[in-house]
Each structure stands twice: as C-alpha cells, then as structure tokens.
C-alpha cells in the first residue's frame, strides 16, 4: 500500500483515482501529476515501484494539500467573518454564501427544519 502525504492510497484502484483520496488533489490535478512525473495512469497503486512512489511524493510535496490547504481555507473564512463582509456574515449565520435563494431549499446549509409547535384546538 502506497502512503503519500500521510494518506494510504487504496491498493486496487488506478493511480489516477487513488491520488484523488488526498485532500486538495482532484482528477485534473492527479492527471497533471502523473503526466509530469511520467507515471502511467493505468497502473494500479499496488503495482507502483518504489521509485515511482518516490517521484509522486517529491512532486506532491510542493503542492498545498491536506492540513495546509484546510488551514488556509479556514483562515480565509475567518478573515471574511472578521472584516464583516457580506460573505462573512453569511458564513456566520450559516446561510448559503454564493447567492442561492433561501425561501425554499438551502437545507444543507441551514440544517434540519425547525418546526413551530401548533396549538391544539379546544372543543
């Protein structure tokens, strides 16, 4: 099992897909990494040689991934909140940030519905 950037890549998957298990590396970035390192994208992770794994590690070492990337995103959101921008206010309130409507939908961002209790009718 190849371990790159502190992540165990799944053995049975192709390298191209396996690299996407690292936070900050999607399919296009994965394809670019393989093209520039010269590793065949159809190779399974379990079939990688130690030399190929080291090539991938050295290339990925220069990218902003995992903890560094998560920290940067969190700091960017924190900065927006502190300066009081519109986007920061939306983050603080837990509402959609990118202009989506909220009259209906937006349940993922707002959380489950908060039901208001209905009074029982007296006879």
Curated annotation (Swiss-Prot):
Gene3D superfamilies: 1.10.8.50, 30s ribosomal protein s13, domain 2 (4.10.910.10). InterPro entries: Rbsml_uS13_C, Ribosomal_uS13, Ribosomal_uS13-like_H2TH, Ribosomal_uS13_bac-type, Ribosomal_uS13_CS. One of its GO terms (molecular function) is rRNA binding. Keywords: Ribonucleoprotein, Ribosomal protein, RNA-binding, rRNA-binding, tRNA-binding. Pfam families: Ribosomal_S13 (PF00416). This is Small ribosomal subunit protein uS13. Belongs to the universal ribosomal protein uS13 family. Residues 92-123 are annotated as: Disordered. The lineage of its organism: Bacteria, Bacillati, Bacillota, Clostridia, Eubacteriales. Located at the top of the head of the 30S subunit, it contacts several helices of the 16S rRNA. In the 70S ribosome it contacts the 23S rRNA (bridge B1a) and protein L5 of the 50S subunit (bridge B1b), connecting the 2 subunits; these bridges are implicated in subunit movement. Contacts the tRNAs in the A and P-sites. The gene is rpsM. GO terms for biological process: translation. One of its GO terms (cellular component) is small ribosomal subunit. Part of the 30S ribosomal subunit. Forms a loose heterodimer with protein S19. Forms two bridges to the 50S subunit in the 70S ribosome.
């Amino acid at each position: 099992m190849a371990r790159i950037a502190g992540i165990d890549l799944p053995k049975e998957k192709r390298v191209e897909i396996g690299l996407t298990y690292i936070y900050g590396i999607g399919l296009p970035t994965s394809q670019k990494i393989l093209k520039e390192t010269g590793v065949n994208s159809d190779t399974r992770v379990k079939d990688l040689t130690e030399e190929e794994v080291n090539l991938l590690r050295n290339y990925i070492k220069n990218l902003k991934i995992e903890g560094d990337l998560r920290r940067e995103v969190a700091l960017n959101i924190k900065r927006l909140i502190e300066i009081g921008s519109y986007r920061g206010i939306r983050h603080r309130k837990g509402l959609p940030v990118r202009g989506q409507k909220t009259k209906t939908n937006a349940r993922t961002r707002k959380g489950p519905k908060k039901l208001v209790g209905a009074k029982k009718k007296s006879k």
